[in-house]
């Protein structure tokens, strides 16, 4: 078979598969995020960020990352995969690089991936998220100190305050608490014993 013809056929097949994924609506039974009014305590400031779409989009309760200001299921049929970095042909790093791409609107930060399924926060209350976050069985075996480090220094977490622009050139929404205030709140909450208030 002619190599050029084979190349054209494979390209057409790939484009067709991408079109099918892009135009297939994925239905999910995942519950919506439970929101409530923010108060002025360190816990509430921290949770206002952790329950914001910039965090929840990558902490889904199913195998589909979310995207956009409306937190819709990721385009192109992207799925979690065994290592939380997508499946063979649709790895996170195929599109998401180490920084935002202002030409395409694709967001990026180092170590772009979904949180492990044990760290699913979608549909949980703030109290449930905090309990999960402090439970070594759910948080990857982290101590409180390691959890604070992750929440306040990890580049992917801090990306939330530099989320770039979307494909239409519109700025993405940042969390409702400024970064410095959030970091202080996380550290203050931990220093006070990481107490979780009653619901």
Which functions belong to the PLM regions below?
Residues 53-62, 89-99, 186:
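The canonical Cys-X-X-Cys-His
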Residues 42, 51-54:
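Short N-terminal amphipathic alpha-helix/helix-capping patch enriched in small hydrophobics
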Residues 1-47, 67, 78-83, 101-199:
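N-terminal export/targeting leaders of redox proteins
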Residues 49, 86-89:
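Processing junctions and N-termini across compartments
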Residues 55-85:
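N-terminal, post-signal-peptide region of Sec/Tat-exported proteins
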């Amino acid at each position: 078979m002619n190599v050029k013809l084979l190349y054209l056929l494979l390209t057409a097949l790939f484009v067709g598969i991408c079109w099918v994924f892009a135009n297939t609506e994925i239905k999910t039974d995942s519950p919506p995020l439970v929101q409530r009014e923010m108060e002025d305590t360190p816990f509430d400031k921290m949770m206002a960020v952790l329950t914001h779409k910039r965090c929840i989009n990558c902490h889904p309760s199913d195998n589909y990352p979310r995207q956009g200001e409306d937190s819709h299921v990721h385009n192109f049929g992207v799925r979690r995969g065994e290592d939380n970095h997508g499946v063979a042909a649709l790895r996170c790093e195929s599109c998401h690089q180490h920084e935002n791409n202002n030409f395409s609107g694709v967001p990026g930060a180092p170590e772009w991936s979904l949180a492990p399924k044990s760290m699913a926060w979608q549909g949980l209350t703030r109290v449930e998220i905090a309990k999960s976050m402090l439970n070594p069985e759910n948080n990857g075996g982290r101590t409180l100190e390691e959890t604070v480090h992750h929440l306040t220094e990890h580049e992917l977490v801090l990306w939330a305050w530099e989320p770039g622009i979307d494909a239409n050139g519109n700025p993405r929404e940042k969390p409702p608490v400024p970064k410095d205030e959030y970091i202080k709140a996380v550290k203050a909450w931990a220093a006070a014993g990481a107490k979780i208030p009653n619901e």
